[in-house]
Amino acid sequence: MTEAENRVTLGFEAEVKQLLHLMIHSLYGNKEIFLRELISNASDAADKLRFSALGNDALYEGDSRLRVRIEFDKAARTLSISDNGIGMTREEVQHNIGTIARSGTRHFFESLTGDEAKDSQLIGQFGVGFYSAFIVADKVVLETRKAGVPAEEGARWESSGEGSYTLETLTRPERGTRVTLHLREGEDEFLDGWKLRAIIRKFSDHISLPIEMKRETGEPKEGEEAPAEVWETVNSASALWAKNRDEITDEAYDEFYKHVSHDFQEPLARVHSRVEGTNEYTLLLYIPKHAPFDLWDRDSKRGVKLYVRKVFIMEDSDKLMPRYLRFVRGVIDSDSLPLNVSREILQENKQLEKIRGGAVKKVLGLLEDLANNEPEKYQAFWKEFGQVLKEGLIEDFANKDRLAKLLRFSSTHTDSEEQTVTLDEYVSRMKEGQDKIYFVSAESFGAARNSPHLEIFRKKDIEVLLLSDRIDEWLVSYLTEYEGKPLQSVARGDLDLGKLEGEEEKAEAAAEKEAFAPLTERLKKALEAKVNDVRLSHRLTDSPACLISESYGMSRTMERIMKSAGQNIPGSKPILEINPHHGLIARLNTEADQTRFQDLASLLLDQAVLAEGGQLDDPAEFVHKLNGLLQSLL
C-alpha cells in the first residue's frame, strides 16, 4: 500500500460535526469531564480485554497487568491518556469515532433548544465519550492496535474537530490505545500534575483499574543523572461496590454512576446490597434522573454490567434486567458464577436467573420506597420511565401485583394530564355500590378527557381513569382486575352501572328503548354498511351520539394504533349509540324525507368518529353534506 493509499482524509457525519460544535460551546463550563470520559473509555477497553482473554489468554501478549496512564508535556502542550486494553482495528476506529451509530440520535438532535444550559444537560444524557476531548483540545491524535493482531496493523486517527479526520495504518508494538490532546491556548491547568491528580481523584477514584502518573522529581542538578521513571497509582483502584456502604460518600456513589452510565447528572436513586448464601453477589444499581435517548430501543445492550469476582463479563441488559427495567444502570458482581463463564452458558444458567430475580426485587423495592416515602421523586421517575414500567405488567407476571401498585394514571378526579393517581387511591374514592374500575382510552389526553363516553360518569361524579399512552391498550388487556375489582372500559359493550343506577332510571331507559325502537331500526338500515348496530345510549348526556366496541372485540383506539403501525387489521364495524334527549336525535325521529334523513344519519356517524379522535374515510363528502345542511337552514 502506498502512503497515499494508506493515509486517507474522511469527513465526519453531519451529526458528529454538530455534536462537536455543541460540546465546545455548551460544556466548557464543566470542561474537566473530558478526562473522566477518556479514562472511562480506557477502563471499558480493559474490561473488554479481560473478558476476551478468558477464552484466549494469548491476547494479553505477556502483559496482563492492565492500567491507564496519564502523561503531559508542558513544552509540547500535550496531554496523553493511554491504556493497554483491547485496542481497535482501523475499521473499528472509523466506525466508532467517525460516526455516531446509536439509536435515538435523530431524536437527540431534534430535542436541542439552542439554550446552552438545557442543551448541556441533553448532551450529558446522550453521552459524548471520546468527543469530549475537543472541549480543551484543538487537535486530537489517537493511536491504537487491537490485541492479538500484528504490530503492523495499528491505526492512527487525527482531527482538529472541524469536519474531517485523517486515518492511516501504522506499526505499533504496544497493544491498546493512546489518545493525545494538543491543548488549546489557555488550558495550561491541564499541564499541571497536581491539578490532574486532583481531577482523577475527584472523578475516577472509584475505577478498579490503576490510573498511573509519573512521579514528579523536578529537574536534576548539573552533573546528576536523571532519576529513573517511577509510575505511581493515583486512584484508590478498588471496586467501589465491594466496599461497605458506610465507607462510601454520596459524592463517590454519584461519580461511579456517571462512570457506568456516561451520564453527566447525578442519579435519582440507588440501591447497594450484598446477598449472601449459596448464590453470593453484590449489586449497585441506579435509577437515572432522565430517560436516555435509546430508551425505546428494546435491543440496546447498555444497562447493567456483570462481573465475576471483579472481572468484567458482559453488559447485556436483558440477561440481568427484564426489558421493562432497561433504564437501570449499575453493576452486579457474582462470587458464585465460574470465572470462565461464556455467554452461551449464561443463556440457561440457573444461578444467573436467581441473581436476575433478586436484582428485580431490589429495584422494585427501591421504587416502592420512593413511592411511599419520597412521592415527589417518584413522580419525577414516573414522568421519565412510567410508560416503560407499564411493560412489566405484560412481561412479568410474577411481579404483577407489585407493579400494579406502582402505576400512576390521569383521571377525571384530578382532571390533569399529569399521571398521579394510584389504583389504591381510585379504589378508596369509589362510590357506594360501585364494583368496577372505569377507564377510557384515547390517542391523546385531550381526546380522553373530552370523550363523550364520560358524560354520564361526570354527571354522577364517578371517577374514570384517562388512558392515553400507546401502551395502555395492551396494559388493560393484561391488568383486567385490581384488588378483586374488574377494570371496565366506558366505551365497550352495554353500560351497566349496577347499583349506581336507580330503579327509576332503569325503568325510564326501558321505556325510551321501546319508544325509539323505530328510529334505531331506521338508522341501522341507513348506516348498515358502516355500523354493526344502533342502540340508545345511557352514557350520553350532552352529545348526540358516540361509537362503542363490542365487549370482547378490539377497541376502537387499539384498531387505530395497529393501523397506524402498518398492521393489516380486519375491518370491524362499531356500534352507534344515540342520545334520546338530544335535539338532533329528536329532529331525526320526525324526519320524513328519506334523502335528508340519510344525510343527517351520515353526519351523525361522522361527528361521532371525530369526537373519539378518529379519521373520516371521506372528509370531502362530510363537508359537502354539512354545507348542504347549513344552506338549508339559511
Curated annotation (Swiss-Prot):
Region named A: 1-343
InterPro entries (UniProt xref): HATPase_C_sf (IPR036890), Heat_shock_protein_90_CS (IPR019805), HSP90_C (IPR037196), Hsp90_fam (IPR001404), Hsp90_N (IPR020575), Ribosomal_Su5_D2-typ_SF (IPR020568)
Region (B): 344-560
Subcellular location: Cytoplasm
SUPFAM superfamilies: ATPase domain of HSP90 chaperone/DNA topoisomerase II/histidine kinase, HSP90 C-terminal domain, Ribosomal protein S5 domain 2-like
Region (C): 561-634
Keyword Chaperone (UniProt): yes
Pfam family, one: HSP90
Single GO term (MF): ATP binding
Signal peptide: none
Coiled coil: none
Nucleotide-binding recorded as keyword: yes
UniProt cross-references to SMART domains, sorted A to Z: HATPase_c
GO terms for cellular component: cytoplasm
Alphabetically ordered keywords of this record: ATP-binding, Chaperone, Cytoplasm, Nucleotide-binding, Stress response
Function: Molecular chaperone. Has ATPase activity.
Oligomeric form and interacting partners: Homodimer.
Annotated family: Belongs to the heat shock protein 90 family.
PANTHER family to which the protein is assigned, alphabetical: HEAT SHOCK PROTEIN 90 FAMILY MEMBER
Protein name: Chaperone protein HtpG
